[in-house]
Amino acid sequence: MNKKIGPNIGHNKKSLLNTPVEHIDIKSFDARKIIDGMSKMSFTSRDTARAADIYNEMLADKDCSIFLTLAGSTSAGGCMDLYTDLVKHNMIDAVVATGASIIDMDFFEALGFKHYQGSQFQDDTELRNNYIDRIYDTYIDEEDLQACDKT
């Protein structure tokens, strides 16, 4: 189970940047049973199951072009390997994304820099004092970001 991250964790840069975001490996598990089970649930669970059904129909239709649209920093949130696998396995035909998704975050990690698990409740003044940027509950070392920008 993931450890709980509460308000005002850490007091220095090293303690704040101690848990890198891990990218999900879609090949490491079979999610079909849980998604099938969601079709009998409520709220967005049924929507998720229906979306999976539609996606499977799209994959089966050789005349269908599949566009993956991204906004925001989903790659920073742990989806970068997922997107790579979708392309490698011909599960999407095109990607439409904001600059933050591809230029900033993917390039940042391609250079070897990391995103870190954090807290949306962390005091922003403390983060600024430690030269750390925050994307909701994800941290970036500002010095790494500046090195990326200079590349």
Predicted regions and their residues:
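Conserved anion/nucleotide-ligand pocket segment
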Residues: 147-151
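Metallocofactor- and cofactor-centric catalytic cores in central/energy metabolism, strongly enriched
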Residues: 2-146
